[in-house]
Amino acid sequence: MDTKVETGGKCPVAHGPAGAKGRGNRDWWPEQLDVQILHQKNKIADPMGPDFDYAEEFRKLDYEALKSDLHALMTDSQDWWPADFGHYGGLFVRMAWHSAGTYRITDGRGGAGAGQQRFAPLNSWPDNANLDKARRLLWPIKQKYGNKISWADLFILTGNVALESMGFKTFGFAGGRADTWEPEELFWGPEGTWLGDERYSGERQLSEPLGAVQMGLIYVNPEGPNGNPDPIAAARDIRETFSRMAMNDEETVALIAGGHTFGKTHGAGDPSLIGAEPEGGALEDQGLGWKSKFGTGFGADTITGGPEVTWTQTPTRWSNFFFENLFNFEWELTKSPAGAHQWKAKNAEPSIPDAHDPSKKHLPTMLTTDLSLRFDPAYEKISRRFLENPDQFADAFARAWFKLTHRDMGPKVRYVGPEVPSEDLIWQDVIPPVDHPLVDDRDVADLKAKVIASGLSVQELVSTAWASASTFRGSDKRGGANGARIRLAPQKDWDVNHPAQLAKVLSVLEGFQQEFNAGQSAGKKISLADLIVLAGAAGVEKAAKAGGHDVTVPFTPGRTDASQEQTDVASFNALKPRADAFRNYLSGHQFMKPEEALVDRARLLTLTAPEMTVLIGGLRVLKAGQPEHGVLTRNPEALTNDFFVNLLDMRTQWAPVAGKEGVYEGRDRKSGELLWTGTRVDLIFGSHSQLRALAEVYAQSDIKEKFVKDFVAAWTKVMNADRFDLV
């Protein structure tokens, strides 16, 4: 076969570094708004096709047979990557933990929900070193069970089985994590080097929305902050990072101690002898990274990071040895063979087994971050309680592990499988099931008529429905209109929701709800959650009619109302918008530009660029949110394309307003008359070439009917974003 490569031409598709492919738009204009990010998870990249239903496939899985195969794998040590202590349990616990542990509550991104550990950058993070071996060990099982188990589910289930095979009783397991087929572009930090920490400002203030202390770590540096072996300083980092993963102090202690009851770390030799990570490896390495030149490169010679620590006397069995060792010994600072800071027990006898030589014993060892659980006052109190009450420790770890591995799955309606726990947990954002007949088309029409006759304005109806539904995050499937939590703390008090106006609208709607429900003889009811969305639909229909179009906004009942007791106020405050560009709202504390916040919010709502564009145009003329800017129409509360027509009108000249950052005024080019005011978010649709192209479509004279149709479709998508029962 002739393998000669012609060098005279170049492939027209961009590959490789900038020097090989030429400079892209973002290279020339690094501050350019990235709209393409809205078109990730494109179905074109999915080999399964549009009709594939993963949850349905999972239900066909021989679940017990799969678990049996996983149990057998735990002790089936392979020559190419031998199991520590003859058991892969510790490796697979770490794999599952690191799959889930990227979750961050600030924006709901990261986590185990899509199997992203298979892709860059996560597959090549320093903290994920040698987890490529864990995934390769799983491949024969994944190959056997095929599409009935996703990689995302398999990672977590394998972690559960690992715990069970080592004598621990887990809280349960839910399947339902469908794989994605390309790496998700996320902001993991500003650094350009592994383990960089430019993410801090001031007195060690970690930038939002980040949840780890250094680039390429899951949480904290196990040697201490920037390698400083100070357990108290490390405790601060631990508390910060674990809280950003939605864990409190008790859950944090349970997770660290529970995870470190098993397995070991690997720092057998000089880290400079480790080869490239998977994404930087040679073609013939076939995606395996971190090839080591130290000794055999595996087994007793394994180098994964710096420390060389085995925490307990029974690293393949559940025990309370972690806490017993932590408190029964005093600790002195030492270094691993790799030169990393770690701690060894003083005046102790060797009692820790060797991972590969049964004739050897070692001194108990700990990481700096382990000692934080003893020397931080709050952590110590919890740790001593767990030391004295092993049953409480086991229960806390089981629950915290379940939360860790399921936090980004959303409500329980998305859970599938025979081991789904029956207990409702408050972090699952519990919504009661429907227990009554639902409204029919005639009821819907009657209720719409009452809403319109109530005197509530289009702006009030649309704003309330949007406020209720737009909290949805496609990242961790939280928020949305279902549950009607807009009426509960904390959402009812958020500034972005205009509490006084919100209370007025909800009072009227609650009156209609009570009147309707009291008048039914067969138990039929409408929830406030449904009525809020229905009222918004009525408002949109009225606005469309005012714009010259008769439309019916689709409405599907079936939402229910959550209680305040089912709502964790602190947890829901994480959903509070710092910016909602759809309502032209901007709070004081920002970590991105307003137009970037627009794209970020659209991405969380799973909107495409055209959907985002049409919603902005419609919501502006309906005066949703902050009406003082961006209402580019002389006919407000009518659903028209005026926003785009007037934004793109060359008779208007825009200029920034002195003393009002991010606010602009549009004046008549000839007379200087003030016509409009707008924000950066408004003007981006005339400035950004891709968004301007979309705005031009909706500003055309022949597009008015399509504009209304597209707005209704995008509106309905947001209203139903959390209706997993409709999928």
Curated annotation (Swiss-Prot):
Species name: Allorhizobium ampelinum (strain ATCC BAA-846 / DSM 112012 / S4) (Agrobacterium vitis (strain S4))
Residue numbers marked as site, Transition state stabilizer: R94
Protein name: Catalase-peroxidase
CDD domains: catalase_peroxidase_1, catalase_peroxidase_2
Reported cofactor(s): heme b
Keywords, ordered alphabetically: Heme, Hydrogen peroxide, Iron, Metal-binding, Oxidoreductase, Peroxidase
InterPro entries: Catalase_peroxidase (IPR000763), Haem_peroxidase (IPR002016), Haem_peroxidase_sf (IPR010255), Peroxidases_AS (IPR019794), Peroxidases_heam-ligand_BS (IPR019793)
Cross-link (Tryptophyl-tyrosyl-methioninium (Trp-Tyr) (with M-245)), chain numbering: W97-Y219
PANTHER family: CATALASE-PEROXIDASE, HYDROPEROXIDASE I, BIFUNCTIONAL CATALASE-PEROXIDASE
Record field: catalytic activity: H2O2 + AH2 = A + 2 H2O; 2 H2O2 = O2 + 2 H2O
HAMAP family linked to this entry: Catal_peroxid
Active-site positions on this chain: H98 (proton acceptor)
Region feature Disordered, mapped onto this chain: 1-26
Assembly information from the UniProt record: Homodimer or homotetramer.
